[in-house]
A protein has these predicted regions:
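Hydrophobic membrane-insertion alpha-helices, especially the h-region
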Residues: 43-58
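Catalytic-core regions of hydrolytic enzymes
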Residues: 215-294
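Active-site-adjacent substrate-binding region
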Residues: 321-348
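A short, glycine/acidic-enriched catalytic loop
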Residues: 209-212, 283-321
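Second-shell loop/turn segments in exported
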Residues: 176-177, 211-222, 244-255, 262-263, ...
């Protein structure tokens, strides 16, 4: 029977493939018919001719094309093998030119809306485990748009609580970032000052009696969200350090402890520029109900995020380069809202430092609240990473040739 094998490979790979197939078929054909042997011999003659054609053609790795070779076998199966065959740009081919619409986009790295398998298992596990929970209080879903906004330009909304700093968002967006990223070296550091911050495991409009929103289980707390961000950035081609150190054994010492962690990584990798302290918020109404910042993006519920950036004034000292962080925050807020409208709560610009004085691209980001589910927060983590990767793409160092 005729078997069609689609090959995408260079000549060396193709040669190895034919050699492997030859040995395999030699064994199989010991018990074969004379007709089968003739067909096999004929198929390898064709393959040898194709290899010679590739070599004589001077093919170079410039334009990828598909090549089909015909193999005659007796099992009647059809297979497709994905490797690579290339031709020189001087060759005439019928392959259509690659258009912009055909080029892969970052969002095609994976289905950004797909719930990771480990989280699906956690949802299943805790749905059973919490089946007999008693209600301790309500959860209110809120979509934040303009509450508390003091400054707005296009899709960037900011809540400015500083006493002396004014904002010109339009001007800030017109200013490029002093960012230069080398993809071969660590460019991003992710850590968690409040490492034990956790989430709801199942979606419901109430929280359980005696429920605690903290856990050191990194499969269920803010570390899992950091992992989602780091993984997506790495799949986008960036080198990321995700530090999972528990910094909040003593809650009051969290920021001093995380500062040591950041200092260690900056000393070991001075090329790190973007430093993200990933948290989740906690908001409670006067009646005890917890607030869940939420929006629906691409038909899937997502935890709303809030970027926090600070300024040197009043009680905040030794923060001379705060404007660099502010610029980065505004650009990232704009990118997130452009790519995923409704993902962001208004950015908080305040009289705070939170270790953001350590680099020019340091931010604290609140990934939903304790009333959000882990699934909602991780979904938002992937969208944040996608937007950050898109922003970083604009500042990648060109490789020296």
């Amino acid at each position: 029977m005729l078997q069609i094998v689609t090959i995408k490979s260079d000549a060396h790979t193709y040669t190895l493939y034919i050699e492997k197939m030859y040995h395999k078929r030699s064994i199989e054909m010991k018990n074969g018919t004379q007709k089968d042997k003739h067909l096999d011999f004929f198929s390898y003659l064709i393959s040898a001719a194709l290899i010679i054609a590739i070599c004589l053609g001077g093919y170079a790795e410039k334009i990828s094309v598909a090549m089909a070779s015909f193999m005659f076998h007796s099992d009647g199966t059809t297979k497709e093998i994905s490797t690579t065959v290339t031709v020189s740009d001087t060759q005439t081919t019928t392959v259509p030119p690659v258009t912009e619409s055909m080029k892969p986009h970052k969002s095609e790295i994976c289905d950004i809306t797909e719930t990771p398998s480990d989280i699906k298992e956690l949802i299943k596990k805790y749905t059973k485990l919490f089946a007999d929970d008693k209600k301790g209080g309500g959860i209110q879903s809120v979509t934040y748009k303009k509450v508390g906004v003091t400054d707005e330009y296009k899709n960037v909304r900011v809540k400015n609580t500083t006493e002396t700093k004014s904002l010109n968002i339009k001007k800030i967006l017109s200013e490029p970032l002093e960012l230069s990223v080398d993809k071969s070296k660590p460019a991003v550091l992710i850590f968690h000052s409040h490492t034990s911050e956790g989430y709801e495991m199942t979606e419901r409009d109430w929280f359980a009696e005696g429920y605690t929103a903290r856990t050191n289980d990194e499969n269920r707390n803010i570390v899992r969200v950091g992992t989602e961000i780091a993984d997506y950035l790495e799949k986008s081609g960036y080198t990321v350090i995700h530090d999972k150190t528990i910094h909040d054994k003593s809650y009051s010492d969290s920021y001093s402890e995380s500062r040591k962690t950041v200092a260690k990584h900056l000393e070991e990798h001075p090329e790190i520029q973007i430093v993200l302290d990933i948290h989740r918020d906690s908001m409670t109404q006067n009646n005890g109900d917890k607030i869940k910042p939420i929006n629906t993006i691409a038909d899937k519920k997502a935890a709303q995020l809030m970027i926090i950036t600070g300024a040197e004034e009043g009680k905040v000292k030794d923060f001379p380069d705060w404007e660099d962080n502010l610029r980065f925050a505004v650009h990232l807020q704009n990118k997130c809202e452009t790519m995923y409208p409704g993902l962001m709560r208004p950015m908080l610009f305040s009289q705070r430092k939170y270790n953001m004085d350590m680099t020019h691209f340091s931010l604290l980001i609140e990934m939903g609240s304790e009333a959000n589910t882990l699934e909602e927060a991780c979904y938002s983590g992937r969208m944040l990473a996608s937007a950050l990767a898109s922003l970083m793409d604009e500042y990648v160092k060109e490789e020296k040739k």
